[in-house]
Amino acid sequence: MVAFSALSGVSALSLLLCLVQHAHGVSLKVSTQGGNSSSPILYGFMFEDINHSGDGGIYGQLLQNPGLQGTTPNLTAWAAVGDATIAIDGDSPLTSAIPSTIKLDVADDATGAVGLTNEGYWGIPVDGSEFQSSFWIKGDYSGDITVRLVGNYTGTEYGSATITHTSTADNFTQASVKFPTTKAPDGNVLYELTVDGSVAAGSSLNFGYLTLFGETYKSRENGLKPQLANVLADMKGSFLRFPGGNNLEGNSAENRWKWNETIGDLWDRPGREGTWTYYNTDGLGLHEYFYWCEDLGLVPVLGVWDGFALESGGNTPITGDALTPYIDDVLNELEYILGDTSTTYGAWRAANGQEEPWNLTMVEIGNEDMLGGGCESYAERFTAFYDAIHAAYPDLILIASTSEADCLPESMPEGSWVDYHDYSTPDGLVGQFNYFDNLDRSVPYFIGEYSRWEIDWPNMKGSVSEAVFMIGFERNSDVVKMAAYAPLLQLVNSTQWTPDLIGYTQSPDDIFLSTSYYVQEMFSRNRGDTIKEVTSDSDFGPLYWVASSAGDSYYVKLANYGSETQDLTVSIPGTSTGKLTVLADNDPDAYNSDTQTLVTPSESTVQASNGTFTFSLPAWAVAVLAAN
């Protein structure tokens, strides 16, 4: 859990106010009457496998390159142990999806332990939970097989198990082990699988699709890492958009994310070359995304491929009759998700372990089709997919992948939404504060991706600018229905995009919560169902605000995008006490990272006098007053 430091009485931040310059006081009066309804699912998550956020990130399988997947398989992350060598064997496939396995050639005079190691994704996090490993083996062998987790540089053993297993040269057989572990101090841990060299001497053994899991979130099979899932749960988001993003599109039609190759047993998933420079195992597949939504209480927002791949692949959008097989593929996917067991694809889902249909209400057609040559044909492509999906599933909310009018049909179909993305500078985000004030209320908005960009780690200036942007769309959350910061996760050792919301390494305790994370958490955890009118004697800037209510509770969100302290009076008739949460630093460049945590929120209890709260907001600050 993310713990805020609790302060009673006067906030520690207020003790510094005499040292900094104050602006004139700002008075805010929150109406307790009327207001506009606010979307109940406003804050949530956008996920795609970028920065090893899936494989090597939130997905719980810990071995890198577990099945030698890909058109050009390699031995990345694997090495031999003892008097033996390893090689790729394309003549002993495990399945049609896993055509290559690891061949272990044992020396004629071998003794002791021989086998193979895997270094994980820049390490393996051993957290002290029970671990389990599975693998396939082929070759004439009858004897002990040992799995160990051992320090890469220290040789310290953090857990092990030995089983007796018999295999033959005719077929692959699967073996699995479970074992307790002790917590490792860092991620410098190797997975080691060995056999008895004296028994295997002079022979060859093949190993296929090896896996390693620690404890998973809510003990879900093939599930999520609890360390990262817990941090997301703390945010209390409402939805999950998946599987992308650029990673949905692929670099070509053939390389797109294919739903039916991400289901079933892991060794029946071929994986794919992701669009962010590394291969995706697709162990985190369609089922796993829906279980993620179930376990964190999130509304699923499914992205489907719409005939357009990334421009970097030199692709021309697919249009006309050539779209038909791709539309059919989406309809098959939706039947798999929503169909009962009397349908072909619903029965397939049940055979894969999910008897009941999932609860899917939202589908986004494509990703960022305003970019890279997709705009001109998107109206045609969106309409083709919309018409087919709406005819089969009229209750689904269908979302266009852009809000740019030039890329959309002249008249959007009734009930459809649009998706608005904004990566910008801090001043650029602040400049968008009132963008949503005058929108056509007949077309709901999904802000599918936004953040400050062009910096390594979120800093206070950027995070405050994001808060200003968020206040702007929350004020208009009758029409802005959902919004998600992006990207969400970042393995510090292998990063393709910065900044990101949450960083981590493979050390069990290494999770780095950015200043932007705390802004997202503060805003998401303090939500009303009605946006209230606020009157003031001051204009917006550098102080920005929005107020909402839920029953007798009121939430006032504030952002100070400036270098002067702001003195405030906030009047909410009928309230008497409140909790003030403040994230602030006088240095606009202050940031949290893998080497420092400089900025965290503080909490204080504040009392009202006749319904009026009086306090000061430091420079470069984001605050939430929760009053009742």
From Swiss-Prot:
Recorded effect of pH on activity: Optimum pH is 4.0. Stable between pH 3.0 and 7.0.
State the reactions this protein catalyses: Hydrolysis of terminal non-reducing alpha-L-arabinofuranoside residues in alpha-L-arabinosides
GO CC term (a single one): extracellular region
Where's it mainly located? secreted
Question: What's the short name of a Pfam family annotated to this entry?
Answer: ASD1_dom
Q: What class of enzyme is it?
A: hydrolase
Report the EC number(s), separated by commas if there are several: 3.2.1.55
Is Glycoprotein set as a keyword in this record? yes
State the family named in the UniProt similarity comment for this chain.
Answer: Belongs to the glycosyl hydrolase 51 family.
Its biological purpose is as follows: Alpha-L-arabinofuranosidase involved in the degradation of arabinoxylan, a major component of plant hemicellulose. Acts only on small linear 1,5-alpha-linked L-arabinofuranosyl oligosaccharides.
The protein depicted here goes by the name Alpha-L-arabinofuranosidase A
Task: Name the source organism.
Answer: Aspergillus kawachii (strain NBRC 4308)
